[in-house]
C-alpha cells in the first residue's frame, strides 16, 4: 500500500505544471464539487431542465459527438435568435453528456431565467470524448467537428448568424481562440476564460471583439494574456484592461465591469488579483478556481449579446 501511495503521489506531482496547472491539458481529469455552493445549486436546478441532449453524426469523420442544446422558450421560427457556443474544460472529457453543464456556472449563466429573458438565445454545449487541444497547439478531430455541429444547428433553427458567440474555459477557451484564427469571420464576439493560444497567429486580433479573463496567479493563462497584449500593442490595437479582487461583492464587480465597458473599446481584459479566486483557506489551484468568476458578471454577458457582425 505504501508503494502504491508513493506511486500515486509521484504521478500527481509529475503531471503538475508550473503554477499549479495539471499537465498539458489544463484542468485534465479533475473536477470541483460545488454542492456546498447554494447559489450554484439553485442555478443548476433552474437551468438543467432547459437543455435537451442529442448526438451529432459527423459525415466527414464518421464519428459522433454528444451535445446539449437549449432552444429559447417560445421559439418562433419566423424570428432569428443569437447562439452561444460554450465549451468546458478538460475535467469533463469522457464523462456524461451533461458534465459540461454541471461542472460550473459557464453554460448555466447563459441559460438562466435572467439571461434568457434579457437575451433569448440558443446555448450549444458539446461534450468531448478526449482532450481536444494540447499545449503544443495541436487539435483533435473533435475541434472541427464542433464547427460542423454548429453549422448543423444553424440550419435546423433560425439562428442569427451575425450574432454567434464563442466562449470557453481552459480547454474550451483555447478552442475559442483557435476558432477565431481558423474561422475568423464566424463569430461576432468571444469570451475567453482562463486560457491561452499561440499568439504568433493573432496579429489581426485587434479587429475582433472579445473579453479575456484570467487569474493573476494562473501563470499559463496570465502569461497568455501578457503575450497577447504585446502582440496587440505591436499591431497598434487598443486594449482596455482592469484588475480587481474576485472576492469583491458582486454589485461592486458589476460596477467595475460596467466602467471598463464604458470606455467603449472592442477588446477588454480582466485579471483577478493573485490569490483572490482561491477559497479563504488559500488552498487549491488558481487555474481551476478562476473558471466560474469569468461567467458570473452579468455586465460582461450583456456586452457579448450587444455585439453583432452587422
Model regions: which residues?
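Short beta-strand/loop motif that positions the catalytic acidic residue
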Residues: 211-214
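Active-site machinery of serine-nucleophile hydrolases
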Residues: 83, 87-147
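C-terminal catalytic histidine-bearing segment of alpha/beta-hydrolase fold enzymes
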Residues: 27, 216-222, 238-310
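Gly/Ser-rich "nucleophile elbow"/oxyanion-hole loop immediately N-terminal to the catalytic nucleophile
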Residues: 74-79, 132-170
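Alpha-helical scaffolding within the catalytic cores
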Residues: 101-114, 193-203, 253-256
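Bacterial N-terminal signal peptides
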Residues: 2-10
Amino acid at each position: 500500500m505504501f508503494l502504491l501511495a508513493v506511486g500515486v503521489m509521484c504521478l500527481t506531482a509529475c503531471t503538475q505544471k508550473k503554477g499549479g496547472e495539471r499537465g498539458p491539458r489544463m484542468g485534465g481529469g479533475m473536477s470541483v464539487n460545488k454542492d456546498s455552493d447554494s447559489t450554484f445549486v439553485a442555478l443548476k436546478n433552474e437551468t438543467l431542465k432547459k437543455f435537451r441532449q442529442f448526438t451529432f453524426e459527423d459525415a466527414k469523420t464518421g464519428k459522433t459527438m454528444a451535445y446539449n442544446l437549449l432552444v429559447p422558450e417560445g421559439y418562433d421560427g419566423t424570428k432569428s435568435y443569437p447562439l452561444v457556443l460554450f465549451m468546458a474544460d478538460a475535467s469533463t472529457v469522457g464523462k456524461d453528456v451533461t458534465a459540461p453543464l454541471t461542472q460550473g456556472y459557464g453554460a448555466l449563466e447563459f441559460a438562466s431565467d435572467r439571461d434568457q429573458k434579457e437575451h433569448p438565445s440558443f446555448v450549444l454545449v458539446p461534450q468531448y470524448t478526449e482532450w481536444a487541444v494540447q499545449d503544443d497547439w495541436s487539435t483533435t478531430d473533435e475541434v472541427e467537428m464542433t464547427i460542423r455541429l454548429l453549422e448543423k444547428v444553424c440550419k435546423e433553427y433560425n439562428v442569427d448568424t451575425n450574432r454567434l458567440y464563442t466562449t470557453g474555459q481552459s480547454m474550451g477557451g483555447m478552442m475559442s481562440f483557435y476558432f477565431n484564427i481558423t474561422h475568423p469571420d464566424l463569430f461576432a464576439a468571444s469570451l475567453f476564460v482562463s486560457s491561452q493560444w499561440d499568439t504568433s497567429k493573432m496579429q489581426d486580433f485587434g479587429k475582433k471583439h472579445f473579453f479575456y479573463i484570467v487569474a493573476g496567479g494562473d501563470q499559463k493563462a496570465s502569461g497568455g494574456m501578457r503575450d497577447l497584449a504585446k502582440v496587440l500593442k505591436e499591431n497598434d490595437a487598443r486594449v482596455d484592461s482592469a484588475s480587481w479582487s474576485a472576492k469583491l461583492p458582486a454589485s461592486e464587480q458589476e460596477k467595475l465591469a460596467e466602467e471598463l465597458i464604458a470606455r467603449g473599446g472592442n477588446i477588454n481584459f480582466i485579471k483577478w488579483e493573485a490569490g483572490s479566486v482561491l477559497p479563504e483557506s488559500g488552498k487549491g489551484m488558481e487555474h481551476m478556481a478562476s473558471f466560474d468568476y469569468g461567467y458570473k458578471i452579468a455586465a460582461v454577458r450583456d456586452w457579448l449579446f450587444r455585439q453583432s457582425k452587422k
